[in-house]
Structure formats: structure tokens, C-alpha cells
């Protein structure tokens, strides 16, 4: 397989922000709708842009709810974000082997930078496409197409890695190969229904898929 470019989603793929996201949603929703939302209820909100989620809940309060969410999220970011096993070493190895690495996320750039700095992944990526950079978020192909242009990469030589069906669909729409991650909070079986080309049990599985020997 001739893959020289790897694009990653951020949340739930490279860094474990599940607790942070869930607590941010629960804090926000309980503020406006006390005791109406549970942890299970907000799992469906993980992945899409905040604006899409809050518009479906309360179109009149979208900006206010986003502000409440982000204030809590930023205040608790470093305490609640965790690392996934083998991610750092795998990304470092791919970087050292000369793969072109990018991130495609539906987060705003400020929060993306917080996560990358905290996990010390920030030096490995030549291109980071955030919600601030696009008109259409995943599953639209625009974010991936922008990353490909940024990295001067071809879709047929690129692998998109993500924990959400939006990542898999965006990759398919843009013509890349796709890999799901089995540690997705929505469940391996759910992600498998979108038929990614590969399913990673841990991030280091990428190395064997790509024929790369670790350091």
C-alpha cells in the first residue's frame, strides 16, 4: 500500500478528551435544562460542531450555549484530558520516518493548540485544519481536501484516521483510505458499520499496516 500521508482526527483519536467533552456538555445543558440530560444522552453530540448540536437543541441560545461550553471546557481542559496508549511513540516514529502528518478536527484552533501542547504532539504535524479554517465541517470533504493541499498530498496516498463516523465518511468523500479506532467511545461495532478500510486496536497498529518498523 503506497501511503505517505496520515491525517488524524484529534478528540477521541489522538487525545482522550471524552470526559472533558461529556462534562462540558452536561455542565452546559444542566445550566439551561436542569436534570434533563444524562451522560448517555450527550454521547451523540461528540463529533459534530458545537453549533450544529446546540442549534438542534435551542436555536435562540446557540451562541450563549457555545460560550458556556467553551468556558467550562477551557477551565477544565488540562485536568480532564488524558493520553491514549502508544499514540505519542507511533506519531513520533511516523514523523521520523518521513510521513506527512496532519490533523483534521471540528474544534477551534485555540482548543486544538491546548491539547497538542499538553500532550507534546505539537511538533509532529505540518498541517492542522480546524473548524476556523473551513466553511463545511466533516463529513464534508472540504477539511480533508484543505489538508491534502496544505501537505501537497494525493488522496489515494493518504490515510484518514478517526474515532467518529464523520471521519470515515469525510475520508471516503475525499477519496482517501480510512482507519477507524476501536477505542471510540461510541463503540467499535458502531464505527465498523461505516466500513473503514482498517480498524486499529491501538495506534501502534498503524506501523504494521504501513510496513514501518518502530524505533
Curated annotation (Swiss-Prot):
Gene Ontology MF, one: magnesium ion binding
SUPFAM superfamilies in the cross-refs: HAD-like
Keyword Magnesium part of the UniProt annotation: yes
Enzyme Commission designation: 3.6.1.1
GO cellular component term of the entry, any: cytosol
Positions annotated as active site in the UniProt record: 9 (nucleophile)
Reaction(s) catalysed (UniProt annotation): diphosphate + H2O = 2 phosphate + H(+)
UniProt KW keywords: Hydrolase, Magnesium
Coiled-coil positions: none
InterPro entries from the UniProt entry: HAD-like_hydrolase_sf (IPR050155), HAD-like_sf (IPR036412), HAD-SF_hydro_IA (IPR006439), HAD_2 (IPR041492), HAD_sf (IPR023214), PGP-like_dom2 (IPR023198), Pyrophosphatase_Ppax (IPR023733)
Record GO biological process: DNA repair
Keyword Nucleus: no
Cofactor annotation: Mg(2+)
Function per UniProt: Hydrolyzes pyrophosphate formed during P-Ser-HPr dephosphorylation by HPrK/P. Might play a role in controlling the intracellular pyrophosphate pool.
Similarity comment text for this entry: Belongs to the HAD-like hydrolase superfamily. PpaX family.
Protein name: Pyrophosphatase PpaX
Lineage of the species this protein comes from: Bacteria, Bacillati, Bacillota, Bacilli, Bacillales
Amino acid at each position: 500500500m503506497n501511503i505517505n500521508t496520515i491525517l488524524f482526527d484529534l478528540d477521541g483519536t489522538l487525545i482522550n478528551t471524552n470526559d472533558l467533552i461529556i462534562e462540558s456538555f452536561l455542565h452546559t445543558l444542566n445550566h439551561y435544562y436542569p436534570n434533563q440530560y444524562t451522560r448517555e444522552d450527550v454521547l451523540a453530540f461528540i463529533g459534530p460542531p458545537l453549533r450544529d448540536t446546540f442549534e438542534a437543541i435551542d436555536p435562540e441560545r446557540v451562541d450563549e450555549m457555545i460560550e458556556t461550553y467553551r468556558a467550562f471546557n477551557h477551565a477544565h481542559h488540562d485536568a480532564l484530558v488524558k493520553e491514549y496508549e502508544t499514540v505519542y511513540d507511533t506519531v513520533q516514529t511516523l514523523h521520523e520516518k518521513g510521513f506527512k502528518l496532519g490533523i483534521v478536527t471540528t474544534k477551534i484552533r485555540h482548543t486544538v493548540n491546548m491539547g497538542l501542547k499538553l500532550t507534546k504532539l505539537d511538533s509532529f504535524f505540518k498541517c492542522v485544519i480546524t473548524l476556523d479554517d473551513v466553511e463545511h465541517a466533516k463529513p464534508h470533504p472540504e477539511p480533508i481536501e484543505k489538508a491534502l493541499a496544505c501537505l501537497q498530498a494525493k488522496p489515494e496516498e493518504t490515510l484518514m484516521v478517526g474515532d467518529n463516523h464523520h471521519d470515515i465518511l469525510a475520508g471516503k468523500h475525499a477519496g482517501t483510505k480510512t482507519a477507524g479506532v476501536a477505542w471510540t467511545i461510541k463503540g467499535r461495532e458502531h464505527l465498523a458499520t461505516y466500513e473503514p478500510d482498517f480498524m486499529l486496536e491501538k495506534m501502534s497498529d498503524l506501523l504494521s499496516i504501513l510496513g514501518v518498523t518502530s524505533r
